[in-house]
């Protein structure tokens, strides 16, 4: 038995919303730190913040994921001091080149979470990504 597109959308929307909240939290955190909190930040830094803000307003889709990959990789290359603040979930969510910055063990955890989400979707079972993530990472 397959699920309807509206049921699938509920599972996908919760997953998308969770990651959008992480993106928003990351953005808010880094704005309090150098170089973004400096009175005269350079144009590249301002453009990065603007692109991050625009990404949060952009609808989900291929260009959203591509832009997210570019911005997450830019954090690694241009702002390595911010890496401890970058939620690892965002590297997984945006995928692509971002996966190069994740160890295999971490990728395996996120793969299992995605499989659990898909299984729940197929079985019409309730599923909280946030709860499953916490359990997978030993937070419960």
Where would I find each of the regions flagged by the language model?
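Short, well-ordered helical secondary-structure segments
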Residues: 10-13, 35, 39, 81-82, ...
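Short terminal alpha-helical segments
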Residues: 2-53
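Alpha-helical oligomerization segments
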Residues: 115-140
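Amphipathic protein-protein interaction modules
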Residues: 62-121
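A generic structural signal for ordered alpha-helices
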Residues: 4, 8, 26-33, 50, ...
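Non-catalytic interaction surface on structured domains
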Residues: 45-60, 71-78, 82-86, 95, ...
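Charge-rich, solvent-exposed alpha-helical interaction surfaces
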Residues: 18-29, 47-55, 67, 71-75, ...
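Charged, low-complexity interaction regions
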Residues: 33-42, 57-63, 80-81, 104
């Amino acid at each position: 038995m397959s699920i309807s597109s509206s049921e699938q959308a509920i599972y996908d929307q919760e997953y998308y919303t969770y990651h959008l909240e992480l993106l928003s939290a990351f953005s808010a955190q880094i704005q309090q730190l150098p170089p973004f909190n400096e009175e005269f930040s350079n144009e590249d830094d301002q453009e990065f913040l603007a692109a991050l803000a625009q990404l949060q307003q952009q609808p989900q889709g291929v260009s959203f994921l591509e832009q997210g990959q570019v911005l997450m990789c830019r954090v690694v290359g241009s702002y390595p001091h911010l890496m401890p603040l970058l939620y690892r979930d965002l590297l997984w969510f945006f995928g692509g080149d971002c996966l190069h910055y994740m160890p295999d063990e971490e990728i395996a955890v996120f793969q299992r979470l995605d499989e659990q989400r898909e299984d729940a979707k197929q079985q019409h079972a309730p599923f909280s990504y946030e709860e499953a993530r916490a359990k997978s990472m030993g937070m419960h």
